[in-house]
Each structure stands twice: as C-alpha cells, then as structure tokens.
From Swiss-Prot:
GO terms for biological process: lipid A biosynthetic process; lipopolysaccharide biosynthetic process; protein O-linked glycosylation; response to iron(III) ion. GO terms for molecular function: 4-amino-4-deoxy-L-arabinose transferase activity; mannosyltransferase activity. Its EC number is 2.4.2.43. Belongs to the glycosyltransferase 83 family. Its main location: membrane. This is Undecaprenyl phosphate-alpha-4-amino-4-deoxy-L-arabinose arabinosyl transferase 1. It is an enzyme of class 2 (transferase). It comes from the Bacteria. PANTHER family: MANNOSYLTRANSFERASE YKCB-RELATED, UNDECAPRENYL PHOSPHATE-ALPHA-4-AMINO-4-DEOXY-L-ARABINOSE ARABINOSYL TRANSFERASE. NCBIfam families: PRK13279.1 (NF009784).
Length: 548
C-alpha cells in the first residue's frame, strides 16, 4: 500500500475498520455480568417504572452512580428495544465521538490533518479502548464528556476574542456537569486540576479564574435540578454517594478494588497495543515540551497520577488517559516521518507479531495444562476461532513490518473483535455471560413464585432475561447491601435459615435458586438434604435448584 493510495482511501478504510470492530460484533457478543447487564437492567427498570430521579436495581435503591448514563441508555432501549445493540450503542457512539473530539483537539493545536487522523486512529484501535469502548459501562460516556470539557478549555486558550472564550467556558461547565451526572465529582475535579496547572504554567491564571465563574454557572444550571430532586426523594443519596463512592473508595486500603500504586503501568503498556512500539518515544518527546504537547502531557500525567494514587482501582478508570496519550503518540509518529531511520516502526510491527504468537501459544498451552485450562475438549470451534484472532494480529503486524506502513497497524484487532463473541470458553460463559443458560431454563425459572440467587450479578441477569424485578438474594448482599437496609425491601434478602423456612412454608413448590460455585458453600448441601429433594441442574459454574 503506497502513500498515495493510503491517503486516497484512508477514510474509506477507516470507516470499514469502525464497521468491523465497533458495529458488527455488537449483537453477537452476550452481555457480561455484572457490569453490562447491571446498567442495562437499571435503565430497563427506570423505563418501566417511570422513576427518572432515583436509580433502582432489582427494585432496590442503587446509589453508586448518578442518573445521566441510565437516561441515555433508556432512550436507546426505547428506540431499539431490549437488545444487545440497544444496550451497547450508547457506549460505542460515545467512544466514536471521543475519537472525533481527539481529531478536533489535534487540529486546534497543530493544524495537521494527518496528525489529527493518526491520533483518532490510535485511540479507536487501541486494545483497551476497543475492549472498554464496546462494553456497556459508564466510563466511555464520562470519557466523552470529560474530553469535550478538555477540548473546550483548549479552544478557550486559543480563542483571542471575548465572545469565543465565554462560549468555550460555558461548554466547559456544561460538559463537566454532564460528566458529573454520569459518574460523579471525578468529572469536575480532574479537568479542573489540569486547567489550574495549565493556567499557572502559561501565566494565564488570572484569566482562567475570571472566566471560570461562567463555567461554574453553566455547571450549576445543568446539574442543579437533578441534584436537588434526588436530595428531596432520597435524602441519604448524597451522603452515601460522596463518602462511600468517592472518599472511601479513594482512601480505603481494604477495599475489594484495592491495588498497588503501579497497577496501571502494565495496563497502559498492554492497552496501547498495537501502538506499543511508539509509547515510550512519545512520552520522551512530550517531556521535551515541544510545541503543543504540554497540555496533553499534563492531561495524561495528572489523570494517571490521580488514579494511581487512589486505593480503589479498576482497569476501566484508565480510559480517559488514553485520549491525550493517543494524541502524544500521533505527534511522535508525525515526528518520525522526518527521520530516515525506520527502526521504531519495525520494533512496533515486531511487537505485534510477537503479541499474536504469544496469544496463540497461550491458547495451545492451556489445552495441555490442568492448572490453566481454558477450553474443554469439545470446544474445538472456539479454540480455532481464538487462534485465528491472534493469528490475524500477527499477520497484520508482519504486513506492517514488510510494507513499512503504519496504516495497517490499526487493523490488528479486527480478527479478535469479530471472533471474541464466539470464542469465550464455556466455563467463563456460564457465569460471566449467563443469558443462554437463562433462556434454556426460561420456563422453569419464569413460572416460579420465588426466584433467588447468591450473587447480585446473576440476579441482575435473571431480571434482564426474564423481565421481572422480584429476584431475591440469599447468602450475600454484594453491592446492594446499602439499599437492602431500607425497611420496604426486607423481603428481598433471605439468610440460609430463612430460605429453608421459605421452602418449607411454600410446601417445597414454586421456588428456584441459582447458585454460583456452591461447592464452596454449605447452601447446596442444605438444600439437597431437605425432606423433599429438589431437581438440580449443573451448568458450568452455575447450579440451578428447582422445587417444583
């Protein structure tokens, strides 16, 4: 592929890449629990109940996030029905719009369409972005709003006239408010931190402080109505959301999400594939503070440092960091065009070849390892598809190596994107994507008066699959523990003793329990030694117990 042809067809090939990686796989992959189905079910319940102010999950108050993400998902479900496409189209659209803002931001600074195109391409083809940006969680949505706020500040700095600055600062406040309504204070605090440091470094502190009142006013007007409404309808919402979901998560050492400070370093290294060969050179170049890189460097380093300092860590928190990182990598790739040495490009291509081969080796090794076994012997098609996805990655890497073009690099992930929905091992599928199992047992599950489970994620999956919210919990309360403290939902949780009493009182009829790996607990033994024996069905990590 020569340079002229690449320029001529790059947009056509780019849209083909988007179609193959972001849209075609949407309906083919089952929804993952707990995250994807949780947000789908909250939106479904909101749409059915008409309560647009206070989020509920399984008819239990759920205060972990604000409402905007649920509202947007409600609209998608209203337009497209309760499908995988409807559930995921919001995050996909958010990710693609973030890519477009990356293009716009690069154009504001460098007025270089090739650099801007590369920045957008690097972002949308990065491994972590592809994984999170097509997965129904709130991070892609809040990343869009944070990116829009950061872009607005960039425009405010570069606009000479007062009217343009006022509009830009109104945009900052508006988009920070949308981010706040999606995921909370983080969408305001982190951009403000970057704005402050950038203003000081550019000797424009007075100007930024002066115009910030406009942003604060726009933020208050946008977010204020819901902030007041939820405080009136659920007076303890803000106490829980601020102290538990923000302060405790940031400082709690014993949190379930607690990870070491270096946790995100390997995530960035792996997540930036297939552009890893350019990562360290891009950061080194950015730290030299060449024209235009300071803002994006501050954006990346301050966000990264903040999330690394937090005790509670999740892989998805890194998504906003990949916006400025993609721009820095694209800037470095543009710098390399002026150098005759193609060593960095060859290193990057070689890394992609090696990654594909390592993936193939890992799949093959798992077939002969009892400890790391992924697939059963009857999953031949899944094994072939997994190997094919990694093989495609290596082949594209080899093409980039021998043809000496970076344009091919973005296509590395297409193979995995297309096959991943069909290549998930059954042992993972049974617990993490239980939709098929629920549909297989739809009739015996749906006709039960009492339906219980020992894991919230499975309960949410049952609610989504059966379109009923009267799912009850037993043994564990999980993320619904706070909501279960309300007196009007005391019948939503049963201890083991209460469950046994319920079954007996119901004359051993009309009760179904879905258990996750019950061999580690006493519950299955207790259930199977009752006076009347239940029907027990084993499906991977799930065990279904029926009292008919």
């Amino acid at each position: 592929m020569n340079i002229a042809m690449t320029e001529r067809y790059k947009w056509l090939l780019f849209f083909l890449f988007i179609l193959l990686t972001y849209f075609i796989p949407l309906e083919t992959r089952l929804l993952w629990q707990p995250d994807e189905i949780r947000y789908a079910e909250i939106s479904r319940e909101m749409l059915v109940s008409g309560n647009w102010s206070v989020p509920y999950l399984l008819d239990i108050r759920y205060f972990e996030k604000p409402v905007l993400g649920y509202w947007i998902n409600c609209i998608a479900q209203w337009l497209f029905g309760e499908s995988h496409f409807a559930v995921r189209i919001v995050v996909v659209t958010s990710t693609l719009l973030t890519g477009w803002l990356i293009y716009k931001a690069a154009m504001v600074v460098w007025r270089n369409s090739a650099l801007a195109f590369n920045a957008m391409t690097v972002f949308l083809s990065s491994f972590l972005v592809l994984a999170i940006g097509t997965y129904n969680i709130l991070d892609p949505i809040v990343t869009l709003f944070v990116t829009a706020a950061m872009y607005s500040f960039l425009v405010a700095l570069s606009t000479p006239n007062k009217k343009g600055k006022i509009i830009a600062y109104m945009g900052i406040g508006f988009f920070c408010a949308l981010g706040f309504l999606t995921k909370g204070f983080i969408a305001v605090v982190l951009p403000a931190l970057v704005f402050l440091v950038m203003a000081i470094s550019q000797a424009r502190f007075k100007e930024v402080v002066c115009y910030s009142s406009i942003a604060l006013l726009a933020l208050a007007i946008t977010a204020g109505p819901w902030v007041i409404t939820v405080a009136l309808q659920a007076p303890d919402y803000w106490n829980y959301f601020f102290w538990v979901e923000h302060v405790q998560r940031f400082i709690a050492k014993e949190s379930a999400r607690s990870q070491p400070t270096w946790f995100y370093i390997p995530i960035v290294i792996l997540g930036v594939l297939p552009w890893l060969g350019f990562l360290f050179g891009a950061l080194k170049s950015a730290f030299s503070l060449k024209k235009g890189t300071l803002y994006f460097l501050l954006w990346f380093t301050l966000f990264f440092a903040f999330f690394s300092a937090s005790k509670g860590k999740l892989l998805t928190y890194m998504l906003p960091c990949f916006v400025p990182l993609s721009i820095l990598i694209a800037h470095y790739i543009e710098e390399l065009k002026d150098r005759p040495d193609e060593k960095i490009s060859k290193v990057n291509a070689s890394i992609n070849i090696a990654f594909g081969l390592m993936g193939i080796s890992a799949v093959i090794y798992s077939l002969y390892s009892a400890k790391f076994a992924l697939y059963d012997t009857n999953e031949t098609l899944k094994i072939v598809l997994a190997i094919s996805g990694f093989l495609f990655w290596s082949v594209i890497g080899a093409g980039a190596l021998f043809r000496q073009t970076q344009f091919l690099t973005m296509f590395c992930s297409i193979g995995l994107s297309l096959v991943i929905g069909y290549a998930i091992p059954e042992k993972i599928e049974s617990r993490s994507t239980p939709e098929n199992i629920i549909q297989r047992y739809y009739e015996p599950l749906s006709n039960k008066s009492y339906l219980l489970t020992d894991e919230v994620g499975i309960g949410t999956s049952l609610a989504w699959g059966l379109k009923r919210t009267d799912i009850r919990l037993t043994e564990t309360k999980g993320e619904l523990a706070y909501g279960l403290n309300y007196p009007d939902v005391k019948n939503k949780y049963y201890s083991l003793e209460q469950l046994l009493a319920l079954i007996e009182a119901n004359q051993y009829k009309g009760v179904a329990i879905v258990l996750v790996r019950p061999d580690r607990k006493q519950i299955l033994t207790k259930l199977t030694t009752l006076k009347e024996k239940p029907i027990v069905e084993k499906e991977g990590d799930l065990t279904l117990v029926f009292f008919n």
